Amino acid sequence: MENTHAVHNGIFNYLNEIKISPLSRAYTFSDSVYEVIPFYNFNIIAFDEHITRLDKSCNSLSFKADIEKIAMEIKQLIKKSNLKNGYVYYQISRGIDPIRSHMFDANIQIETFGYVVEHAFK
């Protein structure tokens, strides 16, 4: 875990260094979307399809996500890991509330989080 590459709100770090707020709507309400994106022999599998689905999921929940920036983050995460085979788990939540509430501010800033792990495909 200490050498697992991760990104949180655009800041790259190791997974054990990432700090997620307990008031994240991903944590309190599961108010988030995610995608698991595999790569094999340094090639991302069906990347455009994964990004399109992630974008559609964000739009369906009215998340204001910069999908181009997110796509670049995912590619950077894979590159930083220097892994040949693995997958990226990438999650986008509505954001962090000042206090837990079912109602949310329409202008809340989304929260992004992802990490990459090695996986032996068989």
Report each predicted region and the residues it spans.
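Conserved alpha/beta cores of soluble small-molecule-handling proteins
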Residues: 1-122
